[in-house]
Design a protein with these regions (language model features):
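Aromatic- and glycine-enriched beta-alpha-beta binding-site module
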Residues: 70-130
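Extended cationic-aromatic binding surfaces that line active-site or macromolecule-binding grooves
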Residues: 34-89
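Aromatic/basic-lined ligand-recognition segments
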Residues: 65, 158-171
Length: 224
């Protein structure tokens, strides 16, 4: 199924226009339905170790394939990936740390954490990470975690944020504007019969990382 998704997206990348998409709409609808089924299976299996996402519906986690081109110089109408975000306080629009799957030709990945937090949440996350830095680093330094998710991703400030010492040992962590880690995968990873078993194990490694971040997010959202 995932091989068919990648093939469809490869063709879409070469024919990113409404005429081609409409001619292949039934094919897209069938693949999207299959992807929804896969994401629901992931949710149900992740919920066995992260019960906070139990009851989440896959359809609420999938991102639209249609691009917002209103303010973009790139006027191609469609995204060239299938993706879903599974988090405890909702689906794709959630501010909570969660689990992300992304299928794209030569750009597949699994990811987790908090991406693009609003300023107030970013400030709160930095504060809690700074005050509990040893615990945070210990999570990321565990061998299995570090092997799967080598570094944090996203934009990094050139200088330390205001209010923090410039000689802080883990300055790069605090300079991040996102607290997200990524495991890049070859397309073939998702073609294997046991890909979901492996993905669930990779997501399981994220649980302590997400749990740490969600302590802050829950306070920010007034969920505690």
């Amino acid at each position: 199924m995932n091989a068919e998704i990648i093939q469809f997206l490869t063709e879409l990348r070469q024919n990113n226009n409404r005429e081609w998409f409409q001619a292949n709409k039934s094919r897209y609808d069938s693949l999207r339905k299959g992807f929804i089924d896969e994401v629901q299976q992931l949710i149900d299996r992740i919920a066995l170790f992260d019960p906070e996402i139990a009851g989440l519906e896959a359809k609420d986690c999938l991102f639209r394939i249609y691009r917002d081109i209103r303010f973009s110089p790139d006027k191609t109408p469609y995204k060239i990936h299938f993706a879903a975000y599974m988090a405890s306080c909702g689906g794709r629009g959630s501010e909570c740390a969660g689990y992300y799957i992304h299928l794209e030709p030569d750009g597949c990945l699994l990811s987790g954490g908090v991406w693009c937090p609003p300023p107030a949440l970013l400030k709160a996350l930095r504060k809690d990470i700074y005050e509990n830095i040893e615990d945070f680093v210990a999570i990321m330094e565990k061998p299995a975690f570090k092997k799967t998710y080598p570094t944090m991703e996203g934009e990094v400030l050139k200088r330390m944020p205001t209010g923090y010492p410039s000689d802080f040992k883990y300055d790069e962590i605090l300079r991040h504007k996102d607290f997200s880690v990524v495991s890049y995968k070859p397309d073939e990873f998702f073609f294997e019969p046991d890909w979901m078993d492996k993905a669930v194990e990779d997501f399981k490694l994220l649980y302590p990382f997400n749990q740490f971040l969600n302590y802050t997010v829950d306070e920010y959202l007034g969920r505690v």
